[in-house]
Amino acid sequence: MQIKTKAIVISSLKFQEKSLIVKCFTLSNGLKSYFVRDAFSSRKASQKIAYFQPLSILEIEAVHKNKGTLENFKEIKTAVPFQTIHTDIFKSTIVMFLSEMLHYSIQEEEKNEPLFVFLETALTWLDHHDDISNFHLILLLEITKYLGFYPDVSEIDLPYFEMKEGIFTLFHTSTALSEHETNLLKKLLDLKFDNSQKVFHVVERQILLRVLIDFYSAHLDGFKKPKSLDILKEIFS
């Protein structure tokens, strides 16, 4: 089946000497993996590699066999031409980390249009703004809405957050956050991209990042801690 759709690049992996395997989150079909033959074989072919930087947003034409095998691109072009995301060291570190988080979080080949639209909007915002120190925290929390485990805030006045149940509780359990961690999470729940400046200091951001990764681990089978986590911590320390 031939399709035309937008796609967000999640990862690209060199295969043998000249080819690439590219994983994309597509608007039309969810997660798909594509084989790019001879991506490194010539100057013209190697220009394609620029399309596959982390979280690039593409317009693709592809042949989908939908048999669980690698699919093939027919045509690729940039859908959203980013100006700063892949050149600014802070932003490029964020997208490298977030692409790893999405790699381990989006696990099914099924359409999730609301998540795609949210990610496209968020990445466009990141490209056009400079006050981004809390961007990754807000994004990771918001993504849980679309993956089905956003915190239940109906009892948000209670002092502890229970990670496995995703609820606020009166009593501290073995899988609950401390009261201090819970208060930081409550502050994060109130934030949007446009009102997040200077809310947390460095240590608080690192606590929240650990909390969010643990939260993902508690709710997603097979989730792994991103290898780029230490780089992100270093950049924002």
Swiss-Prot record:
Identify the InterPro entries for this entry: ARFGAP/RecO, DNA_rep/recomb_RecO_N, NA-bd_OB-fold, RecO
Q: Write the protein's name.
A: DNA repair protein RecO
The task this protein performs is described as: Involved in DNA repair and RecF pathway recombination.
Query: Entry's Pfam families?
Result: RecO_C, RecO_N
Biological process (GO) annotations held by this record are: DNA recombination; double-strand break repair
Q: Which family does it belong to?
A: Belongs to the RecO family.
This entry carries the following GO cellular component terms, namely: bacterial nucleoid
List, alphabetically, the Gene3D superfamilies matched: Nucleic acid-binding proteins (2.40.50.140)
| Protein keywords | DNA damage, DNA recombination, DNA repair
Determine if DNA damage is one of this entry's keywords.
Answer: yes
